[in-house]
Amino acid sequence: VIEAFQSAGDVLRLRDVVIRTGYSKGMCFRLLYTLHQCGFLDKVGENHYRLASEVRRRRLYRIGYAAQGQDSSFDREVGLSLARAAEREHIELIVVDNRYQPKIALRSADYLVREQVDLVIEFQTDELIAPAIASKYLEANIPFIAIDIPHPGATYFGANNYQAGLMAGHYMGRWAKKHWNGEVEEILLIELLRAGSLPKARMRGLAAGISEVIRLPAACRTVSIDGDGQFQTSLERVRKYLRESKSKRILVGAANDPSALGALRAFEEAGRAPECVIVGQNAEPEARAELRVANTRLIASVAYFPEKYGDGLLRLALDILARKAAPPAVFTTHQVITPENVDHFYPNDSLLAAPG
């Protein structure tokens, strides 16, 4: 019955407790009366109850969070938003850092199993080890949520990858139609191959979105390279690509913003920035700063709003722990962020760079 109060501020009626617990009305009435008499519940009004203050201060659940890493602002935003939501819900959050490394991710899973957490939120990039990680939680009978990369047996939370790619492709196609009369010579896709099928769907969506807006010339070719989601790797591989490509009108779609910014740097170093336009994914602070630069060749980035992940993840986690019916996948919302609307969606970015 106490677990029916899913957050510290929940005020429930008798029938709410009946619905959440599945117990009979008579049993719930007796239990509510007893819990109130014993000091576990406060009565609010005539027929409403909430957790007593000393119970509210207790951590209702212990949830493990295996963070992807701390190198990108996206990862940090997800972690911070989750920590804020956990604190508000009086949940103990056990945090480990996978540091983008498969071996560490496996050790992190072992640690969370030993900690006997109630649920795990898993954020790791490598699709190849997802089955091994999943088996650890499944054997321990620990429910888990997988962020952005599917894991067998997990509830998925994160990007609608094909849709995010499609939105980017539509925007890029409209830009090419307006500024280049649709005369595109090459499409460069900077992928994140080790993350598997879903980020690849992002790239498929982007290519499809471009084709839905403009009729690509027969001579236009599509080139794919693996940027591994990293600025430096993308910079080096786009440098190599530019040594081989002589195209003058290139649409560049990147799996994430570090890859997009690495590509932009490579084009700028080669003195070929006017020959490209670039669209990123995630709308991270570094990309938003670039969107504010006059005449930048980064024309857009699709936002995933990681600062809102924590609330959505905790709602989903509490539903799972309360044994409510949970969907197999929960998708985040997306928005194309451009130089024209970046200040509307992120009016407080200047505070990020403020001293102190």
What are these regions (language model features)?
Residues 127-163, 186, 284-293, 346:
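Flexible loop/hinge segments that line or gate small-molecule binding clefts
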Residues 1-56:
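N-terminal helix-turn-helix
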Residues 66-80, 95-105, 126, 158-168, ...:
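Hinge/beta->alpha junction and helix N-cap segments in small-molecule ligand-binding domains
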Residues 64-66, 116-124, 143-147, 186-189, ...:
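Periplasmic-binding protein-like
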Residues 61, 198, 210, 305-356:
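Hinge/cleft segment of the Venus flytrap/periplasmic-binding protein
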Residues 52-70, 114:
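N-terminal helix-turn-helix/winged-helix DNA-binding helices
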Residues 113, 172-177, 242, 313-325:
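Short, hydrophobic alpha-helical segments
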Residues 112, 119-138, 206, 224-290:
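Hydrophobic alpha-helical
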